[in-house]
Amino acid sequence: MLFMVEINQTFLYMIDNTSFTVFFSWQSDVPENSDFLRSFIKASIKKLETAQNVNILYDEASRSVVGSQKVEEVILEKIRACDVFIADITPITRIETEEGEKKRIKLLPNPNVAFELGYAMHCLPMEQVLIVLPTGITHGQLPFDFNHNRLIEFDEQTNPMDEEIEKSLAFCMITRTSLVDVIVENPEDKILRP
């Protein structure tokens, strides 16, 4: 449903509960993993569009950008504007340290993905942020800040994206509907319906 909001005779914004954007933050260091995820995400989007009767735009990096804009600014704007943010934190390198006789291994994701994930965690509700990685990685091997989030595992045969994207989109729909309800119940403001 599309709602147009007008306050004091000034058009402010539209609230559209049928169009959504899924942004994929991927790494190119282990391309087969990103390729699996990309295909999983796109397949999930097609299923959800049909099942939920919504439009879902798949987006990533500086895709569909015109001209010579600064890539990092474009990506940050896309992250702020997306409805679901998916970060592929597939480890691309490892650090080994020794503490006495004990060896510790830390697996590190792509720094660009880590930066984009941190920005998304700042801008978006965590219900709209999905952190994915290959199966078989223990939480203790990841950087500290990743260990305290729900991580979604995948492999070549397992596509967790259908359910995860659907849950995040349901959260977006509820949030948008609640926003419209607040605006409608405010007697000083006027809401226009299509």
What residues fall within each predicted segment?
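TIR-domain catalytic/interaction hotspot
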Residues: S62-E116, H122
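Arginine/glycine-rich "motif VI" loop of SF2 helicases in the C-terminal RecA-like domain
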Residues: T50, Y119-E127
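C-terminal interaction surface of TIR/SEFIR-family domains
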Residues: L142-P194
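Conserved N-terminal substructure of TIR/SEFIR domains
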Residues: V5-V84
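Conserved nucleotide-binding/hydrolysis micro-motifs of P-loop NTPases
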Residues: D29-V30, T93, G136-H139
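Nucleic-acid nuclease catalytic cores
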Residues: P125-Q141
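Short glycine-/polar-rich loops that comprise or flank the Walker A/P-loop
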Residues: F20, C82-D83, L124-V129, F146-N149
